[in-house]
Curated annotation (Swiss-Prot):
Main location as per UniProt: cytoplasm
Protein's name in the database: Dephospho-CoA kinase
Biological role: Catalyzes the phosphorylation of the 3'-hydroxyl group of dephosphocoenzyme A to form coenzyme A.
Pathway: Cofactor biosynthesis; coenzyme A biosynthesis; CoA from (R)-pantothenate: step 5/5
Subcellular localization, as worded in the UniProt entry: Cytoplasm
Source organism: Hydrogenovibrio crunogenus (strain DSM 25203 / XCL-2) (Thiomicrospira crunogena)
Origin: domain of life: Bacteria
Family that this chain belongs to: Belongs to the CoaE family.
Reactions accelerated catalytically: 3'-dephospho-CoA + ATP = ADP + CoA + H(+)
């Protein structure tokens, strides 16, 4: 049973592909959701953020995400400090969840890790699945979904790994510009092939 790391840039279809894997009986984990959990109220991650950045980044004992996002968007050293807090906590929690899921003997496990290319392949990932699409399609999808101006989406894209960098770490590439049913068949084929290896 393999653990796949699923990654792709903003607007690449990560949520859709995760759902397609779930439709095939494959449990999935979301690193972003785990990141939210490790900084929830009364969690050690939140206390560490308060120690590092100050209580101005908390509102009623909870993380003020908008304020922290603004800081790290404009300050590379603050972003690095936040990642130094979050990444070990996210990795530890993800490993715990994977071990729990393995006891159920699923066909595979998929962990959505948006920043996998930037942060490196974690030890618990056997193979990396990269979602690929043309940059113009990516931009259109992200603008439509997030209802943000093109300039804001472009800024996010520029902070992420490039398409070439993502493709360089890929063990498997899924083209998310194709019709949903074709993508579903690609996932079924991938699972069938890898179950027999």
């Amino acid at each position: 049973m393999k653990v796949y790391g699923l990654t792709g840039g903003i607007g690449s279809g990560k949520t859709t592909v995760r759902q397609l894997f779930e439709d095939e009986g494959v449990p999935t984990l979301d690193a972003d959701q785990i990141a939210r959990e490790v900084v929830a109220k009364n969690q050690p991650g939140l206390a560490e953020i308060e120690r590092t950045f100050g209580s101005d980044y908390l509102t009623n004992g909870e993380l003020n995400r908008a304020k922290l996002r603004e800081l790290i968007f404009n300050d590379a050293s603050a972003k690095q400090a936040l990642e130094a807090i979050l990444h070990p906590l996210i990795r530890q929690r993800t490993e715990q969840l994977i071990q729990q899921l393995k006891k159920q003997h699923p066909p595979a496990i998929v962990v959505e890790i948006p920043l996998l290319t930037e942060t490196g392949k974690p030890n618990y990932v056997d193979e990396v699945i990269v979602l690929d699409l043309a940059p113009e399609t990516q931009l259109k999808r992200a603008i439509t979904r997030d209802q943000l101006p093109a300039e804001d989406i472009q800024k996010i894209i520029q902070q992420q790994a490039t398409r070439a960098e993502r493709l360089a770490v890929a063990d498997i590439i899924l083209n998310t510009e194709q019709p949903l049913e074709t993508l579903r068949k690609d996932i079924q084929s991938l699972l069938h092939t890898h179950q027999n290896t």
